[in-house]
Swiss-Prot record:
This is Microtubule-associated protein ssm4. Binds to nuclear microtubules with the effect of either modifying their structure or function. This then promotes meiotic nuclear division. It comes from Schizosaccharomyces pombe (strain 972 / ATCC 24843). One of its GO terms (cellular component) is mitotic spindle. The modification Phosphothreonine is found at T606. InterPro entries: CAP-Gly_dom_sf, CAP-Gly_domain. Keywords: Coiled coil, Cytoplasm, Cytoskeleton, Meiosis, Microtubule, Phosphoprotein. The modification Phosphoserine is found at S460.
């Protein structure tokens, strides 16, 4: 496919791909296309037998012949709505014009093809009316005929090829449409989401298919109009060529009277040649007569007086010579008339001997030559009879009267005869030149007749061979008329589809406006959220900064108080220990003391049994736990201590242990 190039999107057996290479390869002859498949169902990565033609991922490249029917160019979608309506109006106008043309009468070209070609046979025996000669313009007409026949044959071949391609394109149109629908499926799905009914989606698919068919049919109709314009041009050319064909048909009738005239002319020419031969023989016979001796010197040496004596001594026989001289003068006048009519130079080969010149000469001569040759023939016969009578008279005079004829009389007769012979020789030369011209004309005309016959045969064969093509053209016209009706129906459907598409487009515009409004609302909400977050963060930062400053101050004050209280507690503990040691002196047996403490704590209430410094310390610890805010080990211990104190069944030994542990930690920090 010559219309594919690198970068085009292609469908190969229903799979989408991109052309990456186009040209000849080393692995096989011909033009190949290297295609990168998008689905990845190929055979290579753009290289074959170690040579790389293009680069792609492995398993996505494939090579396909450019002329294969599996490769199809991906069609383009017409998005503009206005262009579609304009195309429909143009298409309707074209279909109306095509219908009007198809309903017209058959052209002259069809009539000439329907009419059989009549070729008249050449018959030299039956003469016909005279016509104009075949001039040099016929060669130009024949060239035009050959050119027109070649155009007809080429036009027939182009018609057949274009029709087959159109039919194949129409067959493949449905395949193209089914492959192209997948491009629109995404748009249809979005529309179906917005316009929930399923019927609208299917209707849109049908509309898209009809749009595809419409674009395909637009191309076909444009091609059809171009072909019809070519047919009209060829019809006009055939109308121009028809007079030339009639001329060629009448050429046979033109040549018949020519042949008849030539035969008549040749007969006259042969008769004149016989007369000339006879005159030559008579001249020889006259020279053989006795006392027929003279010399040029004697003639040149004659004086005017002797000439006067010669003129005075006129005999009856010399009168006969005068009559002969008058006849010779008549013959000379006839010859002059013939040369004026024919207008051929004495040396015809000095000029260019062309068919046009000869035809001009022969067009002038035909009527007058017959009359002049008849006159010359009669004059020659009369002159021959007179010469014969004069010879008889001369013989009788020679026998009867001795010495009557002098040498001068014989010289006069000889001079007259020689003058006649010279004139006759000139006429013979002219006739020979005419004969040569006629022979050349006959040869050329025979050649042209053969050429014309061959061309007529070729034309008849071409007409016979073009008849099946014409029948096919008529059949295609019928098919086109059917397709035009289908196109009209499709146009009606397309108009309805355009109305529905307009409604859908209006709905799409409304939805797009709503979506834009929603998107603007979302943007406003996001901006508000961001502002609130920023305000909250700023407020939290301010609050945290205030809280931290307050807590630090309070912690410092509490710390100082706690340190004071700790010092007091230490002193009180020391005194309490001393008192306990004094009050309960039981040696170093601590386990017994602990058991005793447990027993005493169980039996008595906590507040009454615990000594006063201990209760004071518990209260202080509770206050500290309530005031301390930052999380630390001290806070955790204080919380545990608070929980233990709040329990009703709390053992004092554990309470004391926790208290001691807390005091140790605080003492270490202090």
């Amino acid at each position: 496919m010559s219309y594919l190039s690198v970068g085009d999107e292609v469908l190969i057996r229903g799979e989408l791909g991109i052309v990456r290479f186009a040209g000849s390869t080393d692995f096989e002859s011909g033009i190949w296309l290297g295609v990168e498949l998008l689905n990845g169902k190929g055979k290579n990565d753009g290289s074959v037998k170690g040579k790389r033609y293009f680069s792609c991922e492995k398993g996505k490249g494939i090579f396909v012949r450019a002329c294969s029917s599996n490769v199809m160019k991906r069609p383009s979608v017409v998005k503009s709505r206005k262009k579609g309506s304009e195309n429909i109006s143009n298409f309707m106008e074209k279909t109306k014009a095509i219908k009007q043309k198809s309903r017209r009468e058959p052209s002259k070209f069809e009539r000439s093809l329907a009419r059989p070609l009549c070729i008249t046979p050449i018959d030299s025996s039956t003469p016909t009316k005279t016509a104009t000669f075949y001039t040099s313009s016929t060669t130009e007409n024949l060239d035009e005929l050959n050119f027109s026949t070649e155009e007809l044959s080429s036009f027939d071949t182009t018609l057949l090829n274009s029709d087959t391609s159109k039919l194949s394109g129409l067959d493949d149109s449905s395949f193209m449409e089914e492959e192209f629908v997948w491009q629109v499926d995404n748009v249809l799905q979005e529309c179906e989401k917005k316009f929930t009914p399923h019927s609208k989606g299917s209707y849109l698919k049908e509309n898209l298919k009809s749009e595809l068919r419409k674009g395909r049919l637009d191309e076909l109709m444009c091609e059809n109009t171009a072909l019809k314009e070519k047919i009209d041009k060829l019809n006009k050319e055939l109308e121009k060529v028809e007079p030339q064909l009639t001329f060629l048909r009448s050429k046979n009738s033109i040549e018949k009277p020519r042949n008849f005239r030539r035969e008549k002319f040749l007969k006259k020419f042969l008769a004149m040649q016989k007369e000339i031969k006879y005159l030559r023989k008579r001249k020889l016979q006259i020279r053989k007569i006795p006392n027929y001796k003279y010399s040029d010197r004697s003639l040149n040496s004659k004086t005017p007086k002797s000439q006067d004596n010669w003129t005075t001594q006129v005999t009856p026989s010399s009168l006969l010579g005068v009559s002969e001289v008058s006849k010779v003068l008549q013959l000379k006048q006839v010859q002059v008339d013939i040369t004026e009519l024919v207008k051929i130079p004495k040396n015809p080969f000095s000029e260019k001997l062309t068919i046009s010149n000869v035809n001009r000469y022969l067009n002038i001569v035909p009527g007058s030559l017959d009359l002049q040759f008849s006159l010359t023939n009669e004059n020659f016969v009369h002159w021959n009879s007179t010469v014969y009578q004069e010879l008889l008279n001369l013989k009788s005079n020679n026998s009867s009267v001795d010495g009557v004829k002098t040498r001068r009389q014989l010289l006069e007769e000889n001079a007259l005869l020689s003058h006649k012979v010279l004139k006759l020789t000139e006429e013979i030369q002219d006739l020979e030149t005419l004969n040569q011209l006629n022979t050349e004309i006959e040869a050329r005309q025979s050649e042209k007749l053969n050429e014309v016959q061959e061309e007529t045969q070729r034309l008849s064969q071409l007409l016979i061979s073009s008849q099946p093509a014409l029948t096919e053209v008529k059949h295609l016209k019928l098919c086109l008329s059917d397709s035009q009706e289908e196109l009209l129906q499709l146009n009606a459907k397309l108009e309805k589809a355009n109305i529905v598409i307009d409604e859908l487009n209006s709905a799409k515009l409304k939805l797009s406006k709503q979506v834009e409004e929603e998107s603007s609302m979302k943007d406003d909400l996001t901006e508000m959220n961001q502002r609130l977050k920023e305000q909250i963060e700023s407020y939290e930062n301010e609050v945290n900064s205030e809280i931290t400053s307050r807590t630090l101050k309070e912690f410092e004050t509490l710390k100082t108080q706690y340190e004071k209280n700790l010092c007091n507690l230490r002193e009180q503990l020391k005194t309490a220990r001393m008192k306990l040691a004094d009050k309960y002196p039981q040696g170093d047996n601590t386990s017994e003391n602990i058991d005793w403490l447990k027993h005493s704590l169980r039996d008595s209430n906590t507040e009454n049994s615990i000594p006063s410094p201990l209760t004071f310390a518990c209260k202080e610890i509770r206050k500290l736990v309530a005031d301390i805010k930052p999380v630390s080990v001290e806070k955790q211990l204080a919380l545990n201590w608070k929980k233990d104190i709040e329990r009703p069944s709390f053992h004092h030994n554990q309470q004391l242990f926790n208290y001691c542990q807390l005091t140790d930690i605080l003492s270490k920090k202090c």
